[in-house]
Amino acid sequence: MLVGQYRQSGRGEYTPVGASPAVSTPQHLISAACEADLIAHGDSFRGAGYTKSPREAEDRYELMLGVIRDQRSPASLLDFGCGLGHLLDHLQQHPRDIRYTGLDLSAKYIEAARRRHPAAEFIQMDVLESDAGLPDYDYVVLNGLFNYRGGIDYQTMLEYWRSLMTVVYRHCRIGLAFNVMSKIVDWERDDLFHLPFDTMAEFVGTKLSRHFVIRHDYRAYEYTTYVYRQPSGE
């Protein structure tokens, strides 16, 4: 995810320059930074928070969809943090039997996504405030939600990741996919969330499910994890 300029308050909270000081929770800070991308870059991969190329964005969509175990059977999928709904564009270009729903905290992104895909379902919700009324889905994908942390300190970002994963996992019947920045890099950026394998695995394995797969075999300096309720083959 991309970035803005941040202002630190006397309480140690960080707010994007130009944003309301009330915007201080991790989810609202990250959402505000992404909305700045939307304003700056419009309907493009940069407007959705990707910094490299359209190809890298497309690669990530395929990685997210790789969580689906049986690609031949119908499945419902929640695109959590859907942004402009570009994953739905990808699904329309590469058809599969997937019932798509998009969800985002940002009203600006949801408004734009609904204009782009008027027949699709999009939900505007902050699930950390309340997930009441959010249906369950076969699969949930969280693409790019945890890559960027801006001025949020590491421990706060870690707790945010744990909290959001706990809530979202309640709403997947089969599995979910998420990505984070890798620690296996030449150098780390202070504004990105580089999550160690063992920290990730300890939480996922003890709090969510011991049935998970780590994908670290693609070009980006990140990794994708698939978490399943049941072991493979069942």
Predicted regions: what is each one?
Residues P74-G83:
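Conserved class I S-adenosyl-L-methionine
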Residues R55-S73:
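Conserved alpha-helix/loop element of class I SAM-dependent methyltransferases that forms part
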Residues S106:
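Conserved SAM/SAH-binding beta-strand->alpha-helix loop
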Residues A113-R114:
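Conserved SAM-binding loop
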Residues P118-L128:
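Conserved SAM-binding strand-loop segment of SAM-dependent methyltransferases
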Residues L2-R46:
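N-terminal, positively charged/glycine-rich alpha-helical extensions of SAM-dependent methyltransferases
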Residues L84-R96:
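Conserved SAM-binding loop of SAM-dependent methyltransferases across substrates and taxa
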Residues Y139-L158:
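A short SAM/SAH-binding and catalytic strip from SAM-dependent methyltransferases
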